[in-house]
Curated annotation (Swiss-Prot):
Residues 24-72 form the F-box domain. InterPro entries: AUF1-like (IPR044809), F-box-like_dom_sf (IPR036047), F-box_dom (IPR001810). This is F-box protein At1g30200. Pfam families: F-box-like.
Protein backbone atom coordinates (compact mmCIF):
# COMPACT_ATOMS: atom_id res chain seq x y z
CA UNK A 1 0.00 0.00 0.00
CA UNK A 2 1.46 3.34 -1.01
CA UNK A 3 0.95 6.83 0.41
CA UNK A 4 1.08 10.09 -1.49
CA UNK A 5 2.69 12.94 0.44
CA UNK A 6 1.40 16.38 -0.41
CA UNK A 7 2.49 19.75 0.90
CA UNK A 8 0.10 21.53 3.20
CA UNK A 9 -1.30 24.64 1.41
CA UNK A 10 -1.90 26.31 4.77
CA UNK A 11 1.78 26.11 5.67
CA UNK A 12 2.71 27.72 2.38
CA UNK A 13 0.37 30.65 3.01
CA UNK A 14 1.21 30.98 6.72
CA UNK A 15 4.80 29.81 7.23
CA UNK A 16 6.11 28.92 10.66
CA UNK A 17 7.30 32.02 12.59
CA UNK A 18 11.04 32.51 12.99
CA UNK A 19 12.44 30.94 16.11
CA UNK A 20 12.61 33.44 18.97
CA UNK A 21 16.08 32.23 19.87
CA UNK A 22 17.45 33.34 16.51
CA UNK A 23 15.96 36.84 16.64
CA UNK A 24 17.51 39.71 18.61
CA UNK A 25 14.78 42.07 19.81
CA UNK A 26 17.37 44.70 20.66
CA UNK A 27 17.86 45.18 16.93
CA UNK A 28 14.46 46.90 16.90
CA UNK A 29 15.65 49.59 19.33
CA UNK A 30 17.25 52.72 17.87
CA UNK A 31 20.77 53.66 18.93
CA UNK A 32 19.49 56.84 20.60
CA UNK A 33 17.26 54.81 22.94
CA UNK A 34 20.05 52.38 23.82
CA UNK A 35 22.37 55.28 24.61
CA UNK A 36 19.69 56.76 26.85
CA UNK A 37 19.48 53.44 28.70
CA UNK A 38 23.27 53.26 29.00
CA UNK A 39 23.28 56.80 30.41
CA UNK A 40 20.91 55.58 33.14
CA UNK A 41 23.18 52.60 33.81
CA UNK A 42 26.21 54.95 34.11
CA UNK A 43 28.33 52.63 36.29
CA UNK A 44 31.44 51.79 34.31
CA UNK A 45 31.47 48.19 35.56
CA UNK A 46 27.90 47.58 34.42
CA UNK A 47 28.74 49.19 31.09
CA UNK A 48 31.56 46.68 30.85
CA UNK A 49 29.01 43.89 31.19
CA UNK A 50 26.91 45.52 28.48
CA UNK A 51 29.88 45.42 26.11
CA UNK A 52 29.87 41.63 26.25
CA UNK A 53 26.24 41.32 25.17
CA UNK A 54 26.73 42.13 21.49
CA UNK A 55 28.88 43.87 18.90
CA UNK A 56 26.33 46.66 18.77
CA UNK A 57 26.49 47.30 22.51
CA UNK A 58 30.26 47.13 22.27
CA UNK A 59 30.28 49.90 19.66
CA UNK A 60 27.76 52.15 21.48
CA UNK A 61 29.15 52.17 25.03
CA UNK A 62 32.06 54.57 24.24
CA UNK A 63 29.47 57.22 23.32
CA UNK A 64 27.77 57.25 26.75
CA UNK A 65 27.43 60.78 28.21
CA UNK A 66 26.92 59.97 31.92
CA UNK A 67 29.59 57.83 33.58
CA UNK A 68 30.14 56.73 37.18
CA UNK A 69 33.48 55.23 38.26
CA UNK A 70 33.60 53.62 41.70
CA UNK A 71 37.15 53.13 42.94
CA UNK A 72 37.24 49.73 44.59
CA UNK A 73 40.17 49.72 46.98
CA UNK A 74 42.83 51.77 48.72
CA UNK A 75 46.39 50.45 48.74
CA UNK A 76 48.88 51.96 51.19
CA UNK A 77 52.18 53.49 50.10
CA UNK A 78 54.28 50.53 51.23
CA UNK A 79 52.26 47.96 49.28
CA UNK A 80 54.82 46.41 46.97
CA UNK A 81 52.16 44.81 44.81
CA UNK A 82 51.26 48.17 43.27
CA UNK A 83 54.67 49.17 41.98
CA UNK A 84 53.49 49.87 38.43
CA UNK A 85 52.94 53.63 38.14
CA UNK A 86 50.61 53.11 35.17
CA UNK A 87 48.09 51.34 37.37
CA UNK A 88 47.73 53.88 40.19
CA UNK A 89 45.37 56.65 41.06
CA UNK A 90 47.39 58.32 43.79
CA UNK A 91 46.13 60.83 46.31
CA UNK A 92 48.72 62.52 48.46
CA UNK A 93 48.16 64.66 51.51
CA UNK A 94 50.64 66.90 53.26
CA UNK A 95 51.70 67.43 56.85
CA UNK A 96 49.98 69.84 59.21
CA UNK A 97 51.51 71.30 62.35
CA UNK A 98 49.26 72.89 64.92
CA UNK A 99 49.67 76.50 66.04
CA UNK A 100 51.54 75.41 69.16
CA UNK A 101 54.36 73.98 67.08
CA UNK A 102 53.67 70.42 68.15
CA UNK A 103 54.37 67.73 65.65
CA UNK A 104 50.69 67.01 65.13
CA UNK A 105 51.19 65.54 61.70
CA UNK A 106 48.35 64.72 59.40
CA UNK A 107 49.99 62.79 56.61
CA UNK A 108 48.88 59.93 54.45
CA UNK A 109 49.62 58.54 51.04
CA UNK A 110 46.95 56.57 49.24
CA UNK A 111 46.93 54.77 45.99
CA UNK A 112 43.43 54.45 44.74
CA UNK A 113 43.17 51.63 42.26
CA UNK A 114 40.23 50.79 40.10
CA UNK A 115 40.37 47.01 40.38
CA UNK A 116 37.75 44.94 38.54
CA UNK A 117 36.88 41.77 40.44
CA UNK A 118 34.87 39.60 38.09
CA UNK A 119 35.98 38.11 34.80
CA UNK A 120 33.55 40.11 32.59
CA UNK A 121 35.08 43.35 33.85
CA UNK A 122 38.41 42.41 32.33
CA UNK A 123 36.91 43.11 28.93
CA UNK A 124 36.40 46.71 29.94
CA UNK A 125 40.16 47.02 30.19
CA UNK A 126 40.43 45.71 26.63
CA UNK A 127 37.76 48.11 25.38
CA UNK A 128 38.67 51.24 27.33
CA UNK A 129 42.31 50.69 28.25
CA UNK A 130 45.01 53.02 26.92
CA UNK A 131 46.51 50.44 24.56
CA UNK A 132 43.29 49.41 22.88
CA UNK A 133 43.21 49.52 19.10
CA UNK A 134 40.23 49.15 16.78
CA UNK A 135 40.22 45.38 17.10
CA UNK A 136 37.09 43.40 16.37
CA UNK A 137 34.60 42.24 18.95
CA UNK A 138 35.71 38.63 18.56
CA UNK A 139 39.34 39.57 19.18
CA UNK A 140 38.41 41.56 22.27
CA UNK A 141 36.26 38.75 23.54
CA UNK A 142 38.98 36.16 23.07
CA UNK A 143 41.36 38.40 25.01
CA UNK A 144 39.24 37.79 28.10
CA UNK A 145 39.87 34.09 27.96
CA UNK A 146 43.60 34.68 27.56
CA UNK A 147 43.73 36.98 30.58
CA UNK A 148 45.19 35.44 33.72
CA UNK A 149 44.33 36.91 37.12
CA UNK A 150 42.73 40.27 37.77
CA UNK A 151 44.08 43.39 36.08
CA UNK A 152 44.07 46.80 37.74
CA UNK A 153 43.17 50.00 35.95
CA UNK A 154 43.12 53.58 37.15
CA UNK A 155 40.06 55.73 36.39
CA UNK A 156 42.14 57.58 33.79
CA UNK A 157 42.76 54.33 31.92
CA UNK A 158 39.19 53.09 32.25
CA UNK A 159 37.84 56.35 30.81
CA UNK A 160 40.38 56.54 28.00
CA UNK A 161 38.07 55.55 25.16
CA UNK A 162 34.88 57.24 26.31
CA UNK A 163 34.68 60.10 23.85
CA UNK A 164 31.42 61.89 24.66
CA UNK A 165 31.26 62.15 28.47
CA UNK A 166 29.31 65.17 29.70
CA UNK A 167 28.77 64.23 33.36
CA UNK A 168 31.43 62.24 35.19
CA UNK A 169 31.30 61.13 38.80
CA UNK A 170 34.20 59.34 40.48
CA UNK A 171 33.54 57.85 43.89
CA UNK A 172 36.37 56.93 46.26
CA UNK A 173 35.81 54.01 48.67
CA UNK A 174 36.36 56.17 51.78
CA UNK A 175 37.08 59.73 52.80
CA UNK A 176 40.72 60.71 53.23
CA UNK A 177 40.31 62.18 56.72
CA UNK A 178 40.64 59.72 59.55
CA UNK A 179 38.19 60.98 62.17
CA UNK A 180 37.08 59.42 65.43
CA UNK A 181 33.70 57.75 65.78
CA UNK A 182 30.93 60.16 66.61
CA UNK A 183 32.58 63.20 65.00
CA UNK A 184 30.80 64.83 62.08
CA UNK A 185 32.98 66.30 59.34
CA UNK A 186 31.85 67.13 55.81
CA UNK A 187 33.23 69.41 53.13
CA UNK A 188 32.40 70.59 49.66
CA UNK A 189 34.82 72.43 47.37
CA UNK A 190 34.53 74.00 43.93
CA UNK A 191 37.65 74.38 41.79
CA UNK A 192 38.69 75.99 38.53
CA UNK A 193 42.43 76.21 37.99
CA UNK A 194 42.57 76.82 41.75
CA UNK A 195 40.15 76.82 44.68
CA UNK A 196 36.95 78.81 44.03
CA UNK A 197 35.24 78.11 47.34
CA UNK A 198 34.98 75.56 50.12
CA UNK A 199 32.43 74.82 52.83
CA UNK A 200 33.22 72.74 55.90
CA UNK A 201 30.62 71.48 58.37
CA UNK A 202 31.66 69.77 61.58
CA UNK A 203 30.53 68.77 65.06
CA UNK A 204 32.45 67.22 67.93
CA UNK A 205 29.60 64.78 68.61
CA UNK A 206 26.16 63.85 67.30
CA UNK A 207 23.46 62.75 69.73
CA UNK A 208 20.37 61.07 68.33
CA UNK A 209 17.10 61.83 70.10
CA UNK A 210 13.52 60.69 69.56
CA UNK A 211 12.00 64.00 70.62
CA UNK A 212 11.20 66.37 67.75
CA UNK A 213 11.95 70.03 68.43
CA UNK A 214 10.80 73.20 66.73
CA UNK A 215 13.99 75.12 66.00
CA UNK A 216 12.01 78.12 64.75
CA UNK A 217 10.99 78.94 68.30
CA UNK A 218 14.33 78.20 69.91
CA UNK A 219 16.34 81.07 71.37
CA UNK A 220 20.13 81.12 71.60
CA UNK A 221 21.00 81.61 75.24
CA UNK A 222 24.52 82.72 74.29
CA UNK A 223 23.29 85.27 71.70
CA UNK A 224 25.46 83.57 69.10
CA UNK A 225 28.72 84.33 70.92
CA UNK A 226 31.56 81.83 71.10
CA UNK A 227 32.24 80.93 74.76
CA UNK A 228 35.68 81.58 76.22
CA UNK A 229 36.19 77.85 76.75
CA UNK A 230 36.24 77.40 72.95
CA UNK A 231 39.66 79.08 72.88
CA UNK A 232 41.10 77.43 75.98
CA UNK A 233 40.02 73.78 75.71
CA UNK A 234 41.39 73.13 72.21
CA UNK A 235 38.12 73.77 70.37
CA UNK A 236 39.58 76.40 68.05
CA UNK A 237 42.70 74.34 67.38
CA UNK A 238 40.55 71.35 66.41
CA UNK A 239 38.55 73.48 63.94
CA UNK A 240 41.76 74.75 62.37
CA UNK A 241 42.93 71.16 61.88
CA UNK A 242 39.55 70.24 60.35
CA UNK A 243 39.81 73.19 57.96
CA UNK A 244 43.37 72.57 56.81
CA UNK A 245 42.81 68.82 56.52
CA UNK A 246 39.72 69.32 54.36
CA UNK A 247 41.52 71.83 52.13
CA UNK A 248 44.44 69.45 51.66
CA UNK A 249 42.10 66.57 50.77
CA UNK A 250 40.24 68.76 48.28
CA UNK A 251 43.40 70.13 46.65
CA UNK A 252 44.87 66.62 46.34
CA UNK A 253 41.75 65.38 44.59
CA UNK A 254 41.84 68.37 42.24
CA UNK A 255 45.47 67.73 41.31
CA UNK A 256 44.72 64.16 40.27
CA UNK A 257 41.83 65.14 38.02
CA UNK A 258 43.94 67.19 35.60
CA UNK A 259 44.75 64.38 33.11
CA UNK A 260 41.10 63.30 32.98
CA UNK A 261 39.95 66.89 32.40
CA UNK A 262 42.48 67.42 29.62
CA UNK A 263 41.52 64.15 27.96
CA UNK A 264 37.73 64.69 28.03
CA UNK A 265 36.96 68.11 26.60
CA UNK A 266 33.25 67.29 26.23
CA UNK A 267 32.76 67.38 30.02
CA UNK A 268 30.07 69.72 31.36
CA UNK A 269 30.34 68.66 35.01
CA UNK A 270 32.70 66.59 37.11
CA UNK A 271 32.18 65.36 40.68
CA UNK A 272 34.72 63.52 42.85
CA UNK A 273 33.11 62.18 46.02
CA UNK A 274 33.57 59.31 48.45
CA UNK A 275 31.31 56.50 49.67
CA UNK A 276 31.44 57.87 53.24
CA UNK A 277 29.89 61.16 52.14
CA UNK A 278 32.80 63.01 53.72
CA UNK A 279 33.90 65.29 50.90
CA UNK A 280 32.70 66.40 47.46
CA UNK A 281 34.75 68.21 44.83
CA UNK A 282 32.74 69.80 42.00
CA UNK A 283 33.67 71.46 38.72
CA UNK A 284 31.29 72.94 36.15
CA UNK A 285 32.00 73.52 32.46
CA UNK A 286 33.40 77.02 32.99
CA UNK A 287 35.73 75.80 35.73
CA UNK A 288 36.84 72.82 33.65
CA UNK A 289 37.72 75.09 30.75
CA UNK A 290 39.58 77.43 33.10
CA UNK A 291 41.82 74.57 34.22
CA UNK A 292 42.61 73.63 30.62
CA UNK A 293 43.56 77.22 29.76
CA UNK A 294 45.32 78.13 33.02
CA UNK A 295 47.56 75.34 34.36
CA UNK A 296 47.19 74.68 38.07
CA UNK A 297 49.88 75.71 40.55
CA UNK A 298 51.19 72.62 42.30
CA UNK A 299 52.31 72.58 45.92
CA UNK A 300 56.00 71.92 46.40
CA UNK A 301 55.24 69.80 49.46
CA UNK A 302 53.22 67.08 47.74
CA UNK A 303 51.15 66.19 44.71
CA UNK A 304 48.27 68.58 45.23
CA UNK A 305 47.09 71.94 43.98
CA UNK A 306 48.47 74.97 45.82
CA UNK A 307 45.85 76.49 48.12
CA UNK A 308 45.77 80.31 47.71
CA UNK A 309 45.54 82.87 50.52
CA UNK A 310 42.05 82.64 51.99
CA UNK A 311 39.33 84.64 53.68
CA UNK A 312 37.18 82.55 56.00
CA UNK A 313 33.96 83.00 57.93
CA UNK A 314 33.22 80.80 60.93
CA UNK A 315 29.95 80.13 62.75
CA UNK A 316 29.86 78.10 65.96
CA UNK A 317 27.20 76.77 68.32
CA UNK A 318 28.09 74.87 71.52
CA UNK A 319 24.87 72.91 71.04
CA UNK A 320 22.49 72.85 68.09
CA UNK A 321 19.08 71.18 68.19
CA UNK A 322 17.82 69.99 64.81
CA UNK A 323 14.11 69.73 63.92
CA UNK A 324 14.23 65.91 64.02
CA UNK A 325 15.55 65.93 67.59
CA UNK A 326 19.21 65.31 66.74
CA UNK A 327 21.64 67.34 68.86
CA UNK A 328 25.00 68.52 67.49
CA UNK A 329 27.65 69.36 70.07
CA UNK A 330 30.23 71.93 68.99
CA UNK A 331 28.54 72.53 65.63
CA UNK A 332 30.80 74.51 63.28
CA UNK A 333 30.43 75.92 59.79
CA UNK A 334 33.36 77.41 57.85
CA UNK A 335 32.93 79.24 54.53
CA UNK A 336 36.10 79.83 52.51
CA UNK A 337 36.98 81.85 49.43
CA UNK A 338 40.34 83.03 48.04
CA UNK A 339 41.38 86.47 49.30
CA UNK A 340 41.47 87.74 45.70
CA UNK A 341 37.93 86.57 44.94
CA UNK A 342 35.39 89.31 44.22
CA UNK A 343 32.53 87.12 45.43
CA UNK A 344 31.14 87.55 48.94
CA UNK A 345 32.18 84.81 51.35
CA UNK A 346 28.81 84.90 53.13
CA UNK A 347 26.64 84.52 50.01
CA UNK A 348 23.46 83.02 51.52
CA UNK A 349 22.41 81.03 48.43
CA UNK A 350 25.83 79.42 48.12
CA UNK A 351 25.95 78.51 51.82
CA UNK A 352 22.47 76.99 51.91
CA UNK A 353 22.99 74.84 48.80
CA UNK A 354 26.38 73.40 49.74
CA UNK A 355 25.10 70.36 51.63
CA UNK A 356 22.26 67.89 51.23
CA UNK A 357 19.68 67.51 53.95
CA UNK A 358 19.68 67.35 56.88
CA UNK A 359 23.05 69.14 56.76
CA UNK A 360 21.68 71.96 54.64
CA UNK A 361 19.36 72.78 57.55
CA UNK A 362 22.34 72.77 59.92
CA UNK A 363 24.15 75.29 57.72
CA UNK A 364 21.09 77.55 57.54
CA UNK A 365 20.75 77.49 61.33
CA UNK A 366 24.42 78.28 61.92
CA UNK A 367 24.65 81.26 59.54
CA UNK A 368 22.00 83.02 61.65
CA UNK A 369 24.53 83.21 64.46
CA UNK A 370 27.38 85.64 64.91
CA UNK A 371 30.03 85.57 62.18
CA UNK A 372 33.75 85.36 62.96
CA UNK A 373 36.38 86.28 60.36
CA UNK A 374 39.69 84.49 59.84
CA UNK A 375 42.48 84.60 57.28
CA UNK A 376 44.91 81.94 56.13
CA UNK A 377 48.09 82.18 54.08
CA UNK A 378 48.70 80.15 50.95
CA UNK A 379 50.07 76.64 51.51
Amino acid sequence: MSYLLRSDPVSRIHPEPQSLTSFDHFDLLPDSLLLLIFDKVADVKDLGRCCIVSRRFHSLVPFVENVLVRVDCVISDDDSSSSDENHRFSLNTASISDAGGAGGSFSALFRLVFAPIFKPFQMLGQILGPKRSSSSFDASFSAINDEIGVTHHSPTQVLKNFGEIRFLKIELPTGELGIEDGILLKWRADFGSTLDNCMILGASSVIQSNSVKNHENSVDEDNGNIPESFYTNGGLKLRVVWTISSLIAASARHYLLQPIINEHKSLDRLVLSDADGQGVLCMNREQLEELRVTPLSASSASKRTLVPALNMRLWYAPELDLPDGTVLKGATLVAIRPSESKKEVCDASWLSDAFEEPFGTVAKMLIKRRTYCLEMNSF
